[in-house]
Amino acid sequence: MTTITKERIELFVKSPLENGLTRGEQMELARIALASLDAETVRYLNKFSGTCVTLEQQPNAADDVAVYIPLYAAPPVPERERIRREHAEWSDKTFGDVGPVGPLKHLSKEALEAAADPSDPLEWADMQFLLWDAQRRMGISDEFITRAMIEKLEINKTRQWPEPKDGEPRLHIKEQPESVVPEECPAELPYAQVKAVADLYALCWQSGEVVTYTPDPEKATIWINNYSGTCVQEYVKLERLQEALAGNSPVIPGGWISCSERMPDNDESKPIAIFTGKCLGQGMFVATYDDDGFFDYWEGMEIIGVSHWMQLPDPPL
């Protein structure tokens, strides 16, 4: 909820063009005005003597506006705002002066639990508490969040979004560079080369997406031209990763790391292995990570519900 201060109103009154009110402040001001219209006068302040009287003590106080100023009882704090303040007091007393990172990491855990049982209102309450706590400890106001939401909504409207899957919406498709079409394509490709392309295709789309693959020479050549130099190396990495997870080779140094403990380096060019929780469709993928989240290494589609990640092993010498 946006809170408008007395100082903010005074600035607006003095210079409305330079200090215009935001939509949130306008709504809050309207709420205050509406509450004051419904409020009952409790006392009348004598502007000259500074004394407060009731109508029983001064029957003409309501009409004598030149002398008396009506005083109203403060409207009750909305229940949601009261709970927000009580939670802030409890959080400060319990956890002390900590930063916003802890609540945000805990928020991802609560989101997974809420996804497992969306009907549980207590999970939703936990997520709201953690979001409030992180926002407050970061020093971000509701007004700031509102402006950011307006900006992000416009960005989201320009993005491409895939069709919902299993009745659930999916996150946007990350922009990919345009394909480079070779000037000449051979009429035929050796079977071994087409087979390698097929294998790589199969690995690229292990995310459960429905993807068609064709050994057509022209399309296969385009694909090889665009992805050669990286895919073969990642192909080997994936095979070694699968062997390690199956117990057929030494365990990868470091092993799986929980996202609640530490996030990967912010490096879009560095592929990593990720694992999603059961409640969001258990699976293992190769992805990259940046400040916006985890993204499929080949398709660029954002992957949510990631619970663990792991560095990929180096290719064999």
From Swiss-Prot:
Which superkingdom?
A: Viruses
Q: Which InterPro entries match?
A: dATP/dGTP_dipphydrolase_MazZ, DUF551
- Full protein name: Eaa protein
Per the UniProt record, the source organism is: Salmonella phage P22 (Bacteriophage P22)
The taxonomic lineage of its organism, from the top, reads: Viruses, Duplodnaviria, Heunggongvirae, Uroviricota, Caudoviricetes
This chain is encoded by the gene named eaa
